């Protein structure tokens, strides 16, 4: 297992809109860390490190969050949970982090990536994508950052469903039925 990336944050005292506005004026991002035991800690962090970390790990990869509470530091495995963006400036305005237990499965929405050109599309069929992400359950360190689906052998009238996905060991889809992910259909007017 490779070393987890770490984000250093500070516990914040000021709460509410006014305090958060003052933080943003100093190019800090307010947030909340919800630990695995259910406690929440209001935090603040520098903008650049959190942006770089988000680019590197996204919403599906676990990392360590180091909380500095007036000199007392504690480190916890975490995931990005909810992110609010500034409506104009396209930067973070508030971030919630979710603490995780590395031994317990978590549920996360994982993006799907489609590769290759389907055989059915090459002969005139139309590719229809029904889902672009899927809820996945796995231990945090086994969670895939994306699920890659090869479309090369997909012919007209064929479908790739949830049960057809290459999920790997310890990873399962959270779905109550075997719904379609992607299909190649006949062009309009043909059967």
Swiss-Prot record:
Record's keyword annotation contains Transferase: no
Cited InterPro entries: Rbsml_bL25/Gln-tRNA_synth_N, Ribosomal_bL25/Gln-tRNA_synth, Ribosomal_bL25_b-dom, Ribosomal_bL25_C, Ribosomal_bL25_long, Ribosomal_L25_dom, Ribosomal_uL5_bac-type
GO biological process, one term: translation
Keywords, ordered alphabetically: Ribonucleoprotein, Ribosomal protein, RNA-binding, rRNA-binding
CDD domains: Ribosomal_L25_TL5_CTC
GO cellular component, one term: cytosolic large ribosomal subunit
Pfam families, per the entry: Ribosomal_L25p (PF01386), Ribosomal_TL5_C (PF14693)
Record keyword Metal-binding present: no
Gene Ontology molecular function: 5S rRNA binding; structural constituent of ribosome
Function: This is one of the proteins that binds to the 5S RNA in the ribosome where it forms part of the central protuberance.
Protein family membership: Belongs to the bacterial ribosomal protein bL25 family. CTC subfamily.
Oligomer and partners: Part of the 50S ribosomal subunit; part of the 5S rRNA/L5/L18/L25 subcomplex. Contacts the 5S rRNA. Binds to the 5S rRNA independently of L5 and L18.
Protein name: Large ribosomal subunit protein bL25
Species of origin: Nitratidesulfovibrio vulgaris (strain DSM 19637 / Miyazaki F) (Desulfovibrio vulgaris)
Gene: rplY
């Amino acid at each position: 297992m490779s070393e987890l990336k770490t984000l250093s944050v500070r516990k914040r005292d000021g709460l509410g809109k006014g305090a958060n506005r003052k933080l943003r004026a100093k190019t800090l991002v307010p947030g909340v860390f919800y630990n695995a035991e259910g406690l929440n800690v209001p935090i603040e962090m520098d903008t650049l490190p959190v942006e770089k970390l988000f680019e590197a790990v996204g919403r599906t990869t676990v990392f360590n969050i180091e909380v500095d509470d007036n000199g007392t530091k504690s480190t916890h495995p975490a995931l990005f949970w909810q992110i609010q963006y500034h409506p104009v400036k396209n930067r973070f305005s508030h971030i919630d982090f979710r603490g995780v237990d590395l031994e317990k499965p978590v549920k996360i929405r994982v993006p799907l990536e489609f590769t290759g050109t389907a055989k059915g599309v090459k002969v005139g069929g139309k590719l229809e994508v029904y889902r672009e992400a899927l809820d996945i359950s796995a231990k945090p360190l086994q969670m895939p950052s994306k699920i890659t689906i090869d479309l090369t052998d997909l012919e007209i009238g064929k479908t790739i469903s949830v049960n057809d996905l290459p999920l790997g060991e310890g990873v399962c889809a959270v779905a109550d039925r075997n719904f379609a992910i992607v299909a190649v259909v006949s062009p309009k007017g043909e059967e």
